[in-house]
Design a protein with these regions (language model features):
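Conserved "HGTGT" condensation-loop signature of ketosynthase/thiolase-family condensing enzymes
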Residues: 1-75
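Residues that mark the start of a beta-strand
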Residues: 3, 104-105
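Short beta-strand segments
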Residues: 8-9, 81, 106-109
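Conserved catalytic cysteine-centered active-site region
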Residues: 52-104
């Protein structure tokens, strides 16, 4: 079994409903965070991108984020939706994939 480690993290600014982000699609906000994570930690293309989605916006927000951020189309990306626990659950799924040897580098949150 491989060990999984959390390298670090970033997030978007927190806004209010109908505030400064109201005209910016979620995938654009997420893509910016994704690009910054890859740059800050000098990550190569990850094996997976796993995004937590607590508001059920529909579709696969992780895939949209990855494509918007310019991540190679071959990198799988999927969304976990368990409401308030989605971010933590996406990290748990990432750890399980790394522990099993299925992946080496995953961006999750």
């Amino acid at each position: 079994m491989e060990n999984a480690y959390i390298l670090g993290g970033l997030r978007s600014y927190v806004g209010v409903v109908n505030g400064m982000y109201r005209h910016i699609p979620a995938e654009v906000l997420g893509a910016e965070v994704l690009k910054q994570v890859m740059e800050k930690y000098q990550l190569r293309e990850p094996d997976y991108i796993i995004a937590g989605n607590g508001v059920g916006a529909g579709g696969n927000i992780a895939r949209l984020m990855a494509l918007t951020a310019g991540v190679d189309i071959s990198v799988p990306a999927f969304t976990v939706d368990v409401q308030c626990g989605s971010g933590l659950e996406s990290i748990a799924v990432a750890a399980a994939k790394i522990n099993s040897g299925e992946a080496d580098v995953i961006i999750a949150g």
